[in-house]
């Protein structure tokens, strides 16, 4: 019985000691519970380096602040945290013997736009034996974003954007449960001088060199004969040998003076189209063109359309005209047409075309030579008067000789 009483007394004594120690520990851990309704424990890097000995209500409230000094952005790194401590601890806290390493990694924006990585500030905080130390049993988040607004400088090109974010890596053994300040959105701004300038390039077109147009002659002159050909693949389609002259008049009057322009074969380019029933010959020269259209019937072909265009520079005047549904230089299929005499065609009231020394053929060529020649009727009209004049002259000469002879015979006889 005395042993049981002594054991009970020892038990009560130990319980009293335990309760006494627990009350002292709670008094030390939570000196003023009335101020813990909304506790805010914030510590800068400088405050974390040494143990916290002050009560929670006197803890300074600090945030991540940015200061502008001499045009550069400098950051005073601060981690603002809120530690819920409304629930009193019922367990016995023992001082940690191994040091707890808190690594706070911050990045600072460099003042210039460079491609180098931002400097990293790493702070190692020693162990704290204060009763208000953060519990090391909470797993940290991957990272938290800084609460202060940061300015991101955009540079042209593919460059990394330096962000003014406070990143807490996984090596940090504490968790920031709630931030005391709301996060502000990051507003990127373009740094002056880094954006690509828009160049308003004004291209001034070089003035085109004006080529002087054809000049007109007041009097007609001899026309050069040119040879113009149009090929259908490797076969000859149109072949023309002729001289062309354009005659212009400024007024629709017979008494209006005429001016003349001769087409130079050396400065003329021939082109055209070939068909089974219709082909055309286009002659391009400086200041204008002449177009001839050939039409083929069952047994003959002819020029069915003639058009011309001429631009004169001094004074600047345009003369143009076209004649449809004409029958000009008609001849048999497979033959060539020849006309030495001048042929004129009125295309408009101010433009007239004249050809001379013409020999041409379209369709049905044998080799590259002209076929049988069919001459124009105007050439015959020139020859016949000449032949008639020659015949009349010969007749007159014969009659004169006969008359003279009669006189001689009559003068040789006398009457007896």
UniProtKB/Swiss-Prot annotation:
Family in the record: Belongs to the LAMP family.
Alphabetized Gene3D superfamilies for the sequence: 2.40.160.110
Annotated Gene Ontology cellular component terms: alveolar lamellar body membrane; cell surface; early endosome; early endosome membrane; intracellular membrane-bounded organelle; late endosome membrane; lysosomal membrane; perinuclear region of cytoplasm
Subcellular location: Cell surface; Lysosome membrane; Cytoplasmic vesicle membrane; Early endosome membrane
Signal peptide interval: 1-27
Low complexity bias (residue ranges): 143-160, 188-208
Chain ranges on the Lumenal side, renumbered to this chain: 28-381
Glycan attachment positions: 112, 158, 164, 200, 232, 266, 291
Tissue-level expression: Detected in tonsil interdigitating dendritic cells, in spleen, lymph node, Peyer's patches in the small instestine, in thymus medulla and in B-cells (at protein level). Expressed in lymphoid organs and dendritic cells. Expressed in lung. Up-regulated in carcinomas of the esophagus, colon, rectum, ureter, stomach, breast, fallopian tube, thyroid and parotid tissues.
Cytoplasmic-side positions: 403-416
Stored PROSITE patterns: LAMP_3 (PS51407)
UniProt region (Disordered), positions on chain: 136-167, 179-219
Protein name as it appears in the record: Lysosome-associated membrane glycoprotein 3
Subunit structure, as described in the record: Monomer. Interacts with FURIN. (Microbial infection) Interacts with mumps virus protein F; this interaction promotes protein F cleavage by FURIN.
One Pfam family it belongs to: Lamp2-like_luminal
Cysteines paired by S-S bonds: 237-274, 339-376
Purpose: Lysosomal membrane glycoprotein which plays a role in the unfolded protein response (UPR) that contributes to protein degradation and cell survival during proteasomal dysfunction. Plays a role in the process of fusion of the lysosome with the autophagosome, thereby modulating the autophagic process. Promotes hepatocellular lipogenesis through activation of the PI3K/Akt pathway. May also play a role in dendritic cell function and in adaptive immunity.
Keyword annotations from UniProtKB, A to Z: Adaptive immunity, Cytoplasmic vesicle, Disulfide bond, Endosome, Glycoprotein, Host-virus interaction, Immunity, Lysosome, Membrane, Signal, Transmembrane, Transmembrane helix
Induction per the UniProt record: By UPR transcription factor ATF4 signaling. (Microbial infection) Upon Salmonella typhimurium infection, at both transcriptional and translational levels.
Location (main, coarse): other
GO biological process, alphabetically ordered: adaptive immune response; establishment of protein localization to organelle; negative regulation of proteasomal protein catabolic process; positive regulation of gene expression; regulation of autophagy; regulation of viral life cycle; response to interferon-alpha
Transmembrane parts of this sequence: 382-402
Membrane topology: Single-pass type I membrane protein
């Amino acid at each position: 019985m005395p042993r049981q009483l002594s054991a009970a007394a020892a038990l009560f004594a130990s319980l009293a000691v335990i309760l006494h120690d627990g009350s002292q520990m709670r008094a030390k851990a939570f000196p003023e519970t009335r101020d813990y309704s909304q506790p805010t424990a914030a510590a800068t890097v400088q405050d974390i380096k040494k143990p916290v000995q002050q009560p929670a209500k006197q803890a300074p409230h600090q945030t991540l602040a940015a200061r502008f000094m001499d045009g550069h952005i400098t950051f005073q790194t601060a981690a603002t945290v809120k530690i819920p401590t409304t629930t009193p601890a019922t367990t016995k806290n023992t001082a940690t013997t191994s040091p707890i390493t808190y690594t706070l990694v911050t990045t600072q924006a460099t003042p210039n736009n460079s491609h180098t990585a931002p400097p990293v500030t790493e702070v190692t905080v020693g162990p704290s034996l204060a009763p208000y130390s953060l519990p090391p049993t909470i797993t940290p988040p991957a990272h938290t974003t800084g609460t202060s607004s940061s300015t991101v400088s955009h540079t042209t090109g593919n460059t990394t954007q330096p962000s003014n974010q406070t990143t807490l890596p996984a090596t940090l053994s504490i968790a920031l449960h709630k931030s005391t300040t709301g996060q502000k959105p990051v507003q990127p701004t373009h740094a002056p001088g880094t954006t690509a300038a828009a160049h308003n390039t004004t291209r001034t077109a070089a003035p085109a060199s004006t080529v002087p147009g054809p000049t007109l002659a007041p009097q007609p002159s001899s026309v050069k004969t040119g040879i113009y050909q149009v090929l259908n693949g490797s076969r000859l389609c149109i072949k023309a040998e002729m001289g062309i002259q354009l005659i212009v008049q400024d007024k629709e009057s017979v008494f209006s003076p005429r001016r003349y322009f001769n087409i130079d074969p050396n400065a003329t380019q021939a082109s055209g189209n070939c068909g089974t029933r219709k082909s055309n010959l286009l002659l391009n020269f400086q200041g204008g063109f002449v177009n001839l259209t050939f039409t083929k019937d069952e047994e003959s072909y002819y020029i069915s359309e003639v058009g011309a265009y001429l631009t004169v520079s001094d004074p600047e005047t345009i003369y143009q005209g076209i004649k449809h549904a004409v029958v000009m230089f008609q001849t048999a299929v497979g033959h060539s047409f020849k006309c030495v005499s001048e042929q004129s065609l009125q295309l408009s009231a101010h433009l007239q075309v004249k050809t001379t020394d013409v020999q041409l053929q379209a369709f049905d060529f044998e080799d590259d030579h002209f076929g049988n020649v069919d001459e124009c009727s105007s050439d015959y009209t020139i020859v016949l008067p000449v032949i008639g004049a020659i015949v009349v002259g010969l007749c007159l000469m014969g009659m004169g000789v006969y008359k003279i002879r009669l006189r001689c015979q009559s003068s040789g006889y006398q009457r007896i």
